[in-house]
């Protein structure tokens, strides 16, 4: 038995300089696990609750001492003496102790920190890498990265409405080559933007945040950068968008303020369809707002056969929301963010449900990240084949890419890079 003898949380800072929770778990054998919890900027209304202090005299109210206290008090008392290898038992005990449907009492940031740190300690106890401990012997698929190289929306101080413009190096033979290709395009894009007189400051996720007039202009710059780096757009590298459309959905309309457009759901679907005709876009995340089920139905009918339609705010990594989407036949992919649901067990349940229904899944970071690279291991553990973890700058993003490179090296000849086969179209 891998007995839990100590759990300790502290308040640390994330990549935006905001407080977050870090948790240490110690087992009786001396095995140890540590996990830091990420935080989002564009958060879905149906996400599990991130507990903040609200004390305006500390961190402008964003402190997490209440969550830290929950870990060091109630959660430690409840879990002390339990077997760290029984992940389901641990996670259910915390869910029951919290007693709310969205983890609002103790905080998803408190519960998730403990959940992930327990898994890491158990992996060390078993003398297994985390991806192997979570996923078992069949964990061997390295994910295609979605690299966010132009930032807009809530992730940047510019007029671009669409939040993320991403590249996916699908022709790479390995994940190490995919990272190299992404870095080459990133630097080519920097030169293209600079030559055109744009700033090359970066946003929250490490992508550039130039003052461009439209999504079309951003995509045109990216295609030029792909070509300048020596690759073919649509063959070597395909494009992906995260519209984060809940952020510009107002009174039943999609208000693209940067482009001066106000569209209904049908107009928004036509907007995406036109972009997909002009550019090799094979994935669109949150193309419609989180509760615009009718809009999602239109989008799925129009583009679902040839484009991956990813539900982030729509599903919030919640098996109940995902089950509703599957019943209604909307979207065809789920974005997986561990802090949206708040435990490792529920995260894995959502991925399994998606795969059984024929949906793809994409492991994802948040805009507020740390050096913690756990999601890289979870991506390999679940064989999900795709990961979203930012651009090719900022060490909080690169920590995940570097971990994937290490995992690929460790797996050796059994490692398989997912490549283009993971996508529709």
Swiss-Prot record:
<feature type="binding site">
    <location>
        <position position="388"/>
    </location>
    <ligand>
        <name>(2R)-2-phosphoglycerate</name>
    </ligand>
</feature>
<dbReference type="GO" id="GO:0004634">
    <property type="term" value="F:phosphopyruvate hydratase activity"/>
</dbReference>
<keyword id="KW-0456">Lyase</keyword>
<dbReference type="InterPro" id="IPR036849">
    <property type="entry name" value="Enolase-like_C_sf"/>
</dbReference>
<dbReference type="GO" id="GO:0006096">
    <property type="term" value="P:glycolytic process"/>
</dbReference>
<comment type="similarity">
    <text>Belongs to the enolase family.</text>
</comment>
<comment type="pathway">
    <text>Carbohydrate degradation; glycolysis; pyruvate from D-glyceraldehyde 3-phosphate: step 4/5.</text>
</comment>
<dbReference type="InterPro" id="IPR020810">
    <property type="entry name" value="Enolase_C"/>
</dbReference>
<feature type="active site" description="Proton donor">
    <location>
        <position position="205"/>
    </location>
</feature>
<dbReference type="GO" id="GO:0005576">
    <property type="term" value="C:extracellular region"/>
</dbReference>
<dbReference type="GO" id="GO:0009986">
    <property type="term" value="C:cell surface"/>
</dbReference>
<dbReference type="InterPro" id="IPR029017">
    <property type="entry name" value="Enolase-like_N"/>
</dbReference>
<dbReference type="Pfam" id="PF03952">
    <property type="entry name" value="Enolase_N"/>
</dbReference>
<dbReference type="GO" id="GO:0000015">
    <property type="term" value="C:phosphopyruvate hydratase complex"/>
</dbReference>
<dbReference type="InterPro" id="IPR020809">
    <property type="entry name" value="Enolase_CS"/>
</dbReference>
<keyword id="KW-0963">Cytoplasm</keyword>
<feature type="active site" description="Proton acceptor">
    <location>
        <position position="337"/>
    </location>
</feature>
<dbReference type="InterPro" id="IPR000941">
    <property type="entry name" value="Enolase"/>
</dbReference>
<protein>
    <recommendedName>
        <fullName>Enolase</fullName>
        <ecNumber>4.2.1.11</ecNumber>
    </recommendedName>
</protein>
<feature type="binding site">
    <location>
        <position position="366"/>
    </location>
    <ligand>
        <name>(2R)-2-phosphoglycerate</name>
    </ligand>
</feature>
<feature type="binding site">
    <location>
        <position position="312"/>
    </location>
    <ligand>
        <name>Mg(2+)</name>
    </ligand>
</feature>
<comment type="function">
    <text>Catalyzes the reversible conversion of 2-phosphoglycerate (2-PG) into phosphoenolpyruvate (PEP). It is essential for the degradation of carbohydrates via glycolysis.</text>
</comment>
<keyword id="KW-0460">Magnesium</keyword>
<keyword id="KW-0479">Metal-binding</keyword>
<feature type="binding site">
    <location>
        <position position="163"/>
    </location>
    <ligand>
        <name>(2R)-2-phosphoglycerate</name>
    </ligand>
</feature>
<feature type="binding site">
    <location>
        <position position="367"/>
    </location>
    <ligand>
        <name>(2R)-2-phosphoglycerate</name>
    </ligand>
</feature>
<dbReference type="InterPro" id="IPR020811">
    <property type="entry name" value="Enolase_N"/>
</dbReference>
<feature type="binding site">
    <location>
        <position position="337"/>
    </location>
    <ligand>
        <name>(2R)-2-phosphoglycerate</name>
    </ligand>
</feature>
<feature type="binding site">
    <location>
        <position position="285"/>
    </location>
    <ligand>
        <name>Mg(2+)</name>
    </ligand>
</feature>
<keyword id="KW-0324">Glycolysis</keyword>
<keyword id="KW-0964">Secreted</keyword>
<feature type="binding site">
    <location>
        <position position="242"/>
    </location>
    <ligand>
        <name>Mg(2+)</name>
    </ligand>
</feature>
<dbReference type="GO" id="GO:0000287">
    <property type="term" value="F:magnesium ion binding"/>
</dbReference>
<dbReference type="Pfam" id="PF00113">
    <property type="entry name" value="Enolase_C"/>
</dbReference>
């Amino acid at each position: 038995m891998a007995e839990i003898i100590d759990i300790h949380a502290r308040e640390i800072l994330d990549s935006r300089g905001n407080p977050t929770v870090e948790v240490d778990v110690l087992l009786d054998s001396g095995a140890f696990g540590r996990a830091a919890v990420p935080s989002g900027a564009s958060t879905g209304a149906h996400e599990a609750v991130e507990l903040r202090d609200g004390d305006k005299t500390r961190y402008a109210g964003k402190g997490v001492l209440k969550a830290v206290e929950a870990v060091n008090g109630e959660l430690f008392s409840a879990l002390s003496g339990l077997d760290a290898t029984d992940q389901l038992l641990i996670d259910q005990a915390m869910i029951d102790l919290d007693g709310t449907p969205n983890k609002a009492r103790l905080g998803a940031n408190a519960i998730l920190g403990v959940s992930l740190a327990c898994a890491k300690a158990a992996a060390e106890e078993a003398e297994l890498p985390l991806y192997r401990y979570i996923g078992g012997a069949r964990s061997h698929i390295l994910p295609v990265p979605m690299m966010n190289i132009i930032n807009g929306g809530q992730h940047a101080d510019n007029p671009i409405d669409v939040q993320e413009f991403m590249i996916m190096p699908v022709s790479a033979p390995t994940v190490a080559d995919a990272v190299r290709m992404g870095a080459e395009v990133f630097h080519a894009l920097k030169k293209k933007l600079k030559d055109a007189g744009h700033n090359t400051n970066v946003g929250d996720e490490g992508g550039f945040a130039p003052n461009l007039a439209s999504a079309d202009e951003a995509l045109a710059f990216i295609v030029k950068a792909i070509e300048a780096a020596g690759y073919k757009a649509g063959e070597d590298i395909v494009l992906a968008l995260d519209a984060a459309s809940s952020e510009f959905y107002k009174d039943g309309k999609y208000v693209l303020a940067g482009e001066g457009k106000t569209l209904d759901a049908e107009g928004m679907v036509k907007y995406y369809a036109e972009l997909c005709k002009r550019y090799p876009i094979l994935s669109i995340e949150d193309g419609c707002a989180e509760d615009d089920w009718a809009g999602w139905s239109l989008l799925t009918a129009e583009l679902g056969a040839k484009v991956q339609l990813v539900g982030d705010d729509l599903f919030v990594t919640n098996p109940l929301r995902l089950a509703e989407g599957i019943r209604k036949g909307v979207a065809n992919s789920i974005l997986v963010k561990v802090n949206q649901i708040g435990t490792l067990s529920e995260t894995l349940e959502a991925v399994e449900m998606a795969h059984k229904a024929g949906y793809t899944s994409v492991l994802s970071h948040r805009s507020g990240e740390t050096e913690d690279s756990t999601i890289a291991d979870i991506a390999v553990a679940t064989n999900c084949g795709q990961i979203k973890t930012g651009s090719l700058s900022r060490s909080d993003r690169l920590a995940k890419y570097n971990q994937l490179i290490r995992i690929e090296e460790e797996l050796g000849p059994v490692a398989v890079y997912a490549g283009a086969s993971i996508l529709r179209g």
